[in-house]
Swiss-Prot record:
SUPFAM superfamilies xref list: P-loop containing nucleoside triphosphate hydrolases (SSF52540), RecA protein, C-terminal domain (SSF54752)
Domain of life: Bacteria
Family: Belongs to the RecA family.
GO cellular component: cytosol
SMART domains: AAA (SM00382)
Gene behind the chain: recA
Main location group: cytoplasm
UniProt-annotated location(s): Cytoplasm
An example molecular function term from Gene Ontology annotations: ATP hydrolysis activity
A Pfam family the protein falls into: RecA_C
HAMAP family: RecA
Organism annotation: Chlamydia caviae (strain ATCC VR-813 / DSM 19441 / 03DC25 / GPIC) (Chlamydophila caviae)
Name of the protein this chain belongs to: Protein RecA
Keyword DNA-binding: yes
An example Gene Ontology biological process: SOS response
Lineage, opening ranks: Bacteria, Pseudomonadati, Chlamydiota, Chlamydiia, Chlamydiales
Length: 350
């Protein structure tokens, strides 16, 4: 078959497919990508937005946040909810753990009057509610807190001590098969918060694993491993908050395995001012001499906490530093892309 005949045959096949399944059921990848640019929601931590490579968590995809207890999983998810609301979006929170604190959510910046919340009795109900909300096309982000608390109905109806092998994993696998396509069509971001467990009898390698089987690992576009790495000490004997480290364990949209560090303060959540200060020092925008921090010819203050408070008060300086950090990050991305192009050109053609 020559080229014109092949082209006619392909056009006939495409016309038949569109007649059978509807317009837009098949198209070139170029047209598809032009109409499906990835929209994101900021996480509240600039260092994490940059580590994710796309400026936040993607809409239309599944995101998993996992880690040990008291590591900041719910705080991070609530910040994403608050940022989605600030963009004019609608957020829903499926609280399977029955542990969401409205006061803390409000303190972080979430509008609790507009935040939809569901506390379902079983895992099947929780996942069905998530799918129906996504199918509506009116919700921007859905948080499921947590996978470990999604108890299958048959387990609830049984007695404590009964063995239910693989029930939760089967439930998750079945639900995610339906949910993935619905999320992509409605451009809804689904955030699954997950806990970690330890495998028994693992002598070599990492014994840690997450609950709910393997399906969530496969269907997630981004997986974030969040850990507490230290305490932020106050002037007295009490702690101000925790220092957090996030590793991007999986990323389908940018290079994975990047890490980000930021502060979670007990009275305000993620410290955006602390993030800006750390990144400004890292990129040599702000100079650190001993305990003093200098920006251009100006002394910002002595001690990290004092400068962080100054950035919280001075919105103009905060925005200026943030813009410079974004400019440097964008420039480094362009350089990396150009270097890759040159490298590919230099390779001999087989």
């Amino acid at each position: 078959m020559n080229v014109p005949d092949r082209k006619k045959a392909l056009e006939a096949a495409i016309a038949y497919i569109e007649k059978q399944f509807g317009a837009g059921s098949i198209m070139s990848l170029g047209k598809h990508s032009a109409t499906h640019e990835i929209s994101t929601i900021k996480t509240g931590a600039l260092s994490l937005d940059l580590a994710l490579g796309i400026g936040g968590v993607p809409k239309g995809r599944i995101v998993e946040i996992f880690g040990p207890e008291s590591s900041g999983k719910t705080t991070l998810a609530t910040h994403i909810v608050a940022n989605a609301q600030k963009m004019g979006g609608v957020a829903a929170y499926i609280d399977a753990e029955h542990a969401l604190d409205p006061g803390y959510a409000s303190l972080i910046g979430a509008n609790i009057n507009d935040l939809m919340i569901s506390q379902p009795d079983c895992g099947e109900d929780a996942l069905s509610i998530a799918e129906l909300l996504a199918r509506s096309g009116a919700v921007d982000v859905i948080v499921i807190d947590s996978v470990a608390a999604l108890v299958p109905k048959s387990e609830l109806e049984g007695d404590i001590g009964d063995v239910h092998v693989g029930l939760q994993a089967r439930m998750m696998s079945q639900a995610l098969r339906k949910l993935t396509a619905t999320l992509a069509r409605s451009q809804t971001c689904a955030i699954f918060i997950n806990q970690i467990r330890e495998k028994i009898g693992v002598s070599f390698g990492n014994p840690e694993t997450t609950t709910g089987g393997r399906a969530l690992k496969f269907y997630s576009s981004i997986r974030m491993d969040i850990r507490r790495i230290g305490a932020i000490k106050g002037n007295e004997s009490f702690d101000l908050g925790n220092r957090i480290k996030v590793k991007v364990a999986k990323n389908k949209l940018a290079p994975p395995f990047r890490t980000a560090e930021f502060d979670i303060l007990f009275n305000e959540g993620i410290s955006s001012a602390g993030c800006i200060l750390d990144l400004a020092v890292e990129h040599n925008i702000v100079e650190k001499k001993g305990s003093w921090f200098n920006y251009q010819d100006r002394k910002l203050g002595q001690g990290r906490e004092a400068v962080r408070e100054e950035l919280k008060k001075n919105k103009k300086l905060f925005d200026e530093l943030e813009k410079r950090i974004y400019d440097i990050s964008s420039a480094s991305k362009v350089v990396a892309v150009e270097e890759k192009k040159e490298e590919l050109k230099a390779q001999p053609v087989a």
